[in-house]
Structure formats: C-alpha cells, structure tokens
C-alpha cells in the first residue's frame, strides 16, 4: 500500500536540504534536488519500518492491529 507524504525542500548554498513534514526526524541533505528526494524516500521508508518493528516488539506477544484513518 503506497502512502503519500509531503517533502519540504530548499536550497542552501551548494546543498539541498529537506524534511518529511508528517514524520519528525526524517530529514536529509544532498548536493542535488533529485538526490535529496531519493534520500528522503529511502530514509522515510527505513524510519517507518523501524517504527513498525519497535511497535510490534513492544506489543508482543499478544496484540491486535487496527487500521486508523485520519
């Protein structure tokens, strides 16, 4: 299931820096805009997976999963 997030990006000197608006701590810095977007995408996917593993580990062994829509 694909989700959409908002990347906030800006150029600062010779660097591009960016953040994922909806997820604290997901930020990157790269030399080009294309590299930045790719790096944000990878970092976001890793952050979501790590958070998922942490949540499941904390809730184990007995838990249920529910979808929540905002």
Regions found by a protein language model. Name each.
Residues 1-6, 34-70:
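Short, charged, surface-exposed hinge/linker loops at domain edges
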Residues 9-21:
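Short aromatic-glycine-(Arg/Gly/Cys) micro-motifs in beta-strand/loop hairpins
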Residues 19, 28, 63-64:
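Intrinsically disordered, low-complexity regulatory regions of eukaryotic regulatory proteins
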Residues 20-23, 41:
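ATP/adenylate-binding site constellation spanning eukaryotic-like Ser/Thr protein kinases
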Residues 24-35:
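A short, exposed loop/beta-hairpin motif centered on an aromatic-Gly-Thr core
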């Amino acid at each position: 299931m694909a989700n959409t997030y908002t990347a906030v990006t800006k150029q600062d000197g010779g660097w591009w820096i960016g953040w994922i608006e909806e997820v604290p701590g997901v930020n990157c810095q790269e030399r080009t805009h294309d590299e930045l977007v790719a790096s944000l995408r990878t970092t976001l996917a890793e952050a979501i997976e790590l958070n998922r593993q942490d949540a499941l580990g904390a809730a184990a062994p007995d838990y249920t999963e529910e979808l929540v829509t905002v």
